[in-house]
Amino acid sequence: NINEAIKELLNGSSKKINTQIVITTHSAHILNSKIHTSNSFNNISYISTPNNEANVVNLHDEIIITSEEDKTKKLNDLKFIKKHIKFKVSDMFFADAIIFVEGVTEETLLSFYIDNHETLGLNKYYIAIFNINGAHGLVYHDLIKLLKIPTIVITDLDIKRTDDEKINFTPINSLDARTTTNATIQKYKGGDDISNITDHYEDENLYITYQSEAVEEYYATSLEEAFILQNHDNNILNNAIKEVKPKIYEEIVGNPETRKNLVDNSYKLQNKLSKSKSDFANWLLYYLSIEDDKEKHPKLPNYINSALDWLKTKLALANDGQ
């Protein structure tokens, strides 16, 4: 590891020589090694050139978590980041942009669409996509703002339902008097009331987005439900659902098929898919991959497209030096 290599090098030097060593790297592995062997962000300098200007951030443990006032929680959050960053997340330091998602479906779809849909204008950039569920992603927000990397946080509206609504799979057609259980939205809105929620939140280089508008008269509570509402008549979506939940699909759509029934049963369907999200994502990816006509691909929900438009603008401005 890095620390042992430096120690060995210094042991072989003359005792009369004071040595300073600077290591520059584009390797997430080397950065990982530094953080984990020293158990610290100290002595790491992050250098970037946004808008053709040098930006240097001298990292140290005291500035990684700044918004948390509880000392114990702050120490635990820092410990979590040091451990968790080992699992691919160190790539964020070398990315042009970052997208945080909360599920395998979002991760799979965004990776495919960014790479394969040139109209999004993002496939020429290195965009790191991290699947970090729920409130755990919040721990990274202070660090992301320090690094000034354009970042999208895609989260879920997570509408709180009554027991009867859960049992009957009642779709939601109004946000009046509704609340959310989502920790990210609660933080940026300053509470759990979503009756007058805005379509997104921006905080410096962070863009937080969620299912803020009704689709086919219903408010989705997850990406899967939003995707179903947006694309209920799309062949690829229907084929993927049939592969994963054939009996549920036939029960809802009927024979002959009435695909409009997917709209009224969107919450029920996303609930039934909740334990099969990896299968659902993989079948979507399969049918997307074999369909060369991109006009036949399902559409990304509007709240995601709006976030990607924001990101494209941010990256274009940085690339042009503005």
Regions found by a protein language model. Name each.
Residues A5, N39-N42, N116-E118:
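Glycine-rich, phosphate-binding/catalytic loops in enzymes
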Residues S45:
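Conserved catalytic/dimer-interface elements of ABC ATPase nucleotide-binding domains
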Residues T24:
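Conserved D-loop beta-strand region of ABC ATPase nucleotide-binding domains
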Residues S27:
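Catalytic "switch" loops of ABC-type ATPases
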Residues N1-N11:
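Conserved Walker B catalytic segment
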Residues K16-N18, L31, S48-Q322:
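Acidic, divalent-metal-binding catalytic cores of TOPRIM
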Residues I30-N42:
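Short regulatory helix/loop adjacent to the ATP-binding pocket of P-loop NTPases
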